Amino acid sequence: MIPSWNSVGLLPALLDSLRDGGEELEVLVVDNGSSDGTVELLRERNVPHLALPRNIGFAAAMNRGIAATAAPFVFGLNADTVVAPGAIAALRQVLAGDPGLGGVQPRILQLEDSNPGNPAAARLYSAGMALTRDGRAVETGAGERQAEVFLRKREIFGVCGAAWLLRRELFARLGGYDESYVSFYEDVDLNVRARIAGSHFAYVPEAVVWHLGNASWQAGFERPGAENARLVSRNRIATQAKFIPATSLPRIVAVELGSLLRAARQGRLGATMRGKLEGLARLPRSLGERRRLARQGDLDAVRRWLGVY
């Protein structure tokens, strides 16, 4: 499942890697109203796709695409990824072999750091999603060389939205991505809800996917950095409010103030502040979701992962 938006320069490498991987796959690209020839490229290559008339956001596009397919496992990919041979088979084997797993994540490497033919030389993009003590999402191992610890299969808090394999049943039971997020932190929110519902996730290093890092997002905006800052600030607050313990509030306030200082240095103070105000305005909804989640499961299923990398 591949959402795209003005990704005509990115999709060929991904589609070629899926074709050459030796797997029988049902590929579907959901195009978010591209204007750069993406849909024409998909037609020329006979790639199954949904052509949406406008950009409805990453989260909504993924929901539309997954609803249009029927496979028991869904492999979600960003348009700026390349899949190494054997990756899908390795992920599927682990997920199919453990009914307690809701999803698995490959070893995601930085595409700009090296050639896809030489994974040993690349830096990590993600060895699994983790949460800081104050509930911010981080990618384990991001930017690091591949030490032995990143070459072992292990349980992780959650899966990175750039590349994951999930059970369709879990995705449907959770109601899919929260479309109000639009983009950014929608994967964090899904992981939070899955954990509270009793699901688990694993990191499978034998499976390798290369990721260019926000290239598929940047292609569609004149000022991608500012929009990124607004959405991340907004959606982080909305997500933290669903599970974070009250004892973490002083830490969160300190971190958020620090983020404003960094945003000012980067010329993104206005966008970051707008995002924070929007996140605060959403608090009644987020707290209502927190109460609902607490009735359905255990918030400690998320909290015990705070600060665990």
Show which residues each predicted segment covers.
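Non-catalytic, C-terminal membrane-associated alpha-helical segments of glycosyltransferases
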Residues: 246-309
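Glycine-rich, basic loop-to-helix element that forms the pyrophosphate-binding segment
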Residues: 52-69, 79, 90
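Short, acidic, metal-binding catalytic loop of nucleotide-sugar glycosyltransferases
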Residues: 16-24
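Short aromatic/hydrophobic "clamp" motif used to bind/position activated sugar donors
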Residues: 74
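Conserved donor NDP-sugar-binding/catalytic core segment of glycosyltransferases
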Residues: 85-125, 129-132, 136
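A conserved acidic beta->alpha catalytic loop
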Residues: 17, 31-40, 54
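A short, conserved alpha-helix in the catalytic core of glycosyltransferases
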Residues: 157-210, 215
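Short beta-strand/loop segment that forms part of the nucleotide-sugar
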Residues: 24-33, 50-52
